[in-house]
């Protein structure tokens, strides 16, 4: 399965027993020549060095806190957009595999958080999408009007 994902370009296999962040940094540098990368969101837990390298290379980065409160709203909206067919992932088999590994956990306030179905199941690609969506969500709302709200009291209304 992994070789098939690599063959279609969904996955890059790098040498070694761990992720050498130089490969990730180089991937962003190369792709920034093709795409306008506005900001790179990251999970602080495992990306401290990579984040510094990205900043040194001139990228703007943003930490996305991994919690029910910070990801609950984006998770709900992402799920709705996915069900409405508004999330475009080119029917990638790797991404579908990530989605099949996601288990939604809910806190007592009905905030959702993605979790793995089991330890051997990976959700990294989905988690990266959700981290991006947490930031992009504000860009999806089109402003209406001037944003100014006028307050009228009962007295004001009676005198109009």
Placement of each model-derived feature along the sequence:
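Short, surface-exposed amphipathic charged segments that create phosphate/polyanion-binding patches used
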Residues: 75-84
